[in-house]
Amino acid sequence: MQIMVNDEAHEVSARTLAALIDELGYSGARIATALNGRFVPVTQRAETLLPDGAQVEIVAPMQGG
């Protein structure tokens, strides 16, 4: 399936947001996620299905000083 992750095209086999996070190597990381412009909390990632052509944003917090 073809989706966009952080504005980059990806061909993935994942069907849920949680599976996508694992497939892209983010499992265990503290991240925020959005699907098609809507925030998806960690508690809903396993049940959130990815449609073909989905726009996914994965954001990791940054420390500053």
Segments predicted by a language model, with ranges:
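Ubiquitin-like/PB1-type beta-grasp interaction modules and other compact soluble beta-rich domains
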Residues: 1-64
